[in-house]
């Protein structure tokens, strides 16, 4: 009862929490496309609208390499990105997984309370993160800004996070396609990859004029340099920062990104086909596929939320208590973490750095793969993709496993699905690590999230167009 009372503590706030009503009937495909486009447009506009009242946003950014993963844009309404939503999801999953909160997903009331707790916690986290950003001087010294501007900045950030929460809920309720969180991440990262590959912006560095876009720069140097071998080497392996501290991408980064795209798409076809038959329609037989990437991009998204919050807290504490032993254990910071736990949990800056500090590399690889595997296992229990949930879905459609009695179907699914979840998380973590070490454009995690999301939308579009009446949620999207 105590666990249920904990959930019930949020009930009094339910009337005050904004909610998108579920559609009364199935939304036509064209309307889903329209709502998805409108949702994306609102997000992109918010990503370009600067915060009102900031003095400066030029201070060092401890979350720079995570911004693509969090769909965040510095100094705009999307400063926090999807961080409050994903952090809330992560915390509630950990509480449920550790049985500090007991939720029976078979009960509709418990499922509704679970969603309510996630939303309530996301709003609290948004206000907390916004307050921390403002009071730590991310936009100028609070003394210079004044109490009124500080409060206005906090309200802007929190309100923007609430809008993102509602946009995601709009799509999740069935008005649009897929998940708002995944859509926002994929869009931001596709934009970033395209820009780094084809940007026409020029920079003057030591060896002359360089284009920011790796492909554009390759064409330019091959036509303008007399030494073609040197031009080819420079196009593939150029490195270094511009005067404005921008890391120029090269063709190796571009092809590494394409390689990651190809590998992820290739792995999408790896699956275990479970034969099923209908009890209602005699002679109907089909298969229920359990994919290798069973939980899709969810594990790496939650792992990124965990590390981003750790890094932000570590940076915040280091700025105030830099001589404290425990604070230094969490992380010693300059522009990025240089030692401590935050350093070892962040990816190596390059493949060369990975070889120079193998302990850092091994800790990062182990943590990423283990955290992703753990989150993957926790996720299936709360997302409707556990063996018991799948067995109920099949039973509700009067489908049973061929060669098995109805009573033994759950046992067989329990043998397959948890293993698939663990393996899915570990593989996704390994892909993210490999992408980082290969030097994919942006970050390995961002490219992985982008690829899995695009493929997920491709599959969903196929189902919508074909009107598949037997489609089951094989790779659950982010709630």
UniProtKB/Swiss-Prot annotation:
Residues 1-34, 98-119, 168-245, 376-415, 459-479 are cytoplasmic. It holds the Pfam family SecY. Belongs to the SecY/SEC61-alpha family. Residues 56-76, 141-146, 267-354, 435-440 are lumenal. It is found in: Endoplasmic reticulum membrane. Its main location: endoplasmic reticulum. One of its GO terms (biological process) is post-translational protein targeting to membrane, translocation. GO terms for molecular function: protein transmembrane transporter activity; ribosome binding; signal sequence binding. Keywords: Endoplasmic reticulum, Membrane, Protein transport, Translocation, Transmembrane, Transmembrane helix, Transport. Heterotrimeric complex composed of SEC61-alpha, SEC61-beta and SEC61-gamma. This is Protein transport protein sec61 subunit alpha. It is a multi-pass membrane protein. Appears to play a crucial role in the insertion of secretory and membrane polypeptides into the ER. It is required for assembly of membrane and secretory proteins and is essential for cell growth. It interacts with other membrane proteins required for protein translocation. Upon binding to sec62/63 complex, secretory precursor polypeptides may engage sec61 to begin membrane penetration event. A cycle of assembly and disassembly of sec62/63 from sec61 may govern the activity of the translocase. GO terms for cellular component: endoplasmic reticulum; fungal-type vacuole; Sec61 translocon complex. It comes from the Eukaryota. It comes from Schizosaccharomyces pombe (strain 972 / ATCC 24843) (Fission yeast). The chain crosses the membrane at residues 35-55, 77-97, 120-140, 147-167, 246-266, 355-375, 416-434, 441-458.
